[in-house]
Amino acid sequence: MTPVVFTPSDEPYLGRELLCAFDNLICSCLELNAKCAPLSHGDELTDLQRAACILVPQTITLALSIRELIRQGYLFGAKVLMRPFVERAVTLMYVFHNSEGLELWNQGWDYRKRPTLQKMADYLNEKLLHGQSPMKGFSQAFNSATHGDPFSAQWNVVFHEGVPVFPVSKNLCSPGLADEICAEAIPWLASAMGMMSAAFNQREVGPGSKTN
């Protein structure tokens, strides 16, 4: 019988290479956060550090939520969480590289004034990559999964005896989708680590590294 609740020893996608990489990055991220968090206590913080104190924990929490949903086989739910997860990581990068964006964040990040996820991605592409990486349609898939348009069906369909069906519970037979979610999550969690490290002047912690 399929377990009602999976544990790390019997989860359905255990052993997937990208899932293992995601796990290792999460451990490194939590280790770095344990170093940076105390630095935010007591001292006067910069505007960037105040933004990081909000955005970094939210990004990590969403990463852990995505990981747990994968463990329990709720892949569509994990996919839907990708947009708020990515948006926080992108916002953190955006306010780090854009002083006007940081000021707008400190003023409350008014939805009528703040840039969209797509516009932030376009700005970062120009700023960091000199426009070399096409970003057109960057937010399209994230929006599709979030808002439930017909295109979103691709992440919630499996084949049963050759017939496409839309599961309402655990999806235990889509390793490709599990890989896709991990592949999307890894670079953005890594970027959040980089921004956290930069905001608090810490070296990033990687697998096998030593901390003080």
Residue ranges and their predicted role:
Residues 52, 78, 82, 135-138:
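Short runs of predominantly hydrophobic/aromatic residues within well-ordered alpha helices
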Residues 81-83, 99-108:
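"Short basic amphipathic alpha-helical interaction patches in structured regions
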Residues 93, 97-100, 150-153:
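Short amphipathic alpha-helical interaction/hinge segments
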